[in-house]
Regions:
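Structural motif
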Residues: 17, 23, 45-48, 63-64, ...
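Glycine-rich phosphate-binding loop of ATP-grasp-fold ATP-dependent ligases
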Residues: 20-22, 49-76, 118, 141-142
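Acidic, proline/serine/threonine- and glycine-rich low-complexity intrinsically disordered segments
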Residues: 154-156
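ATP-grasp fold ATP-binding core
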Residues: 5-8, 12, 42-59, 88-110, ...
């Protein structure tokens, strides 16, 4: 099963995890309404636009952009929606971006203690168990961490049944 980032965040939020707030769009029609709502609810001044495809490395391929104002937002969303995003995890043709997540910016200018973490929950096909992989290093460059300092990536297995999600 592949989940888009926004779907994973929704599951986490339903289970009490604080998440970066945002809205998913598949066109430009609601962009002003969405950005105004995010500003009102979060106080954010900047936005992060994230292509929603089933592949990692979206930022490296140009599918994640930091936007500093509402005027720039429409231009960036327009450039990402409909693009074929090529990442290290796609074919050379890339994947068509049909949806974007417009999220509050959680990195604030001037913050010196900004820290990225990596967490992934996946099924280990060899053991048939759910595996939680995490690191205090990485996020965007987790592949590099795995290659250069694999000891910084921890793995735990769980017998817990993860929530089942039904979609119509």
């Amino acid at each position: 099963m592949n989940l888009h980032e926004y779907q994973g965040k929704k599951i986490l939020a339903q289970h009490g995890v604080n998440i970066q707030r945002g809205v998913v769009l598949d066109n430009l029609n609601e962009i002003d309404k969405v950005s105004n709502k995010l500003i009102e609810e979060t106080g954010t001044e900047w936005f992060v636009v994230k292509a929603q495809i089933h592949a990692g490395g979206r930022g490296k391929g140009g599918g994640v952009k930091l936007v500093k104002n509402q005027m720039e937002l429409k231009e960036v969303v327009s450039s990402i929606l409909g693009m074929n995003l090529v990442t290290p995890q796609t074919s050379k043709e890339g994947k068509l971006v049909r949806k974007v997540l417009i999220a509050e910016d959680v990195y604030y200018p001037g913050e010196s203690e900004t820290k990225e973490f990596y967490v992934s929950i996946l099924l280990n096909r060899n053991t048939g168990k759910n595996m939680i992989m995490y690191s205090t290093e990485g996020g965007v460059d987790i592949e590099s961490v795995a290659e250069k300092t694999p000891e910084l990536i921890s793995v735990s297995y769980t017998h817990l049944t993860l929530p089942t999600i039904y979609s119509v």
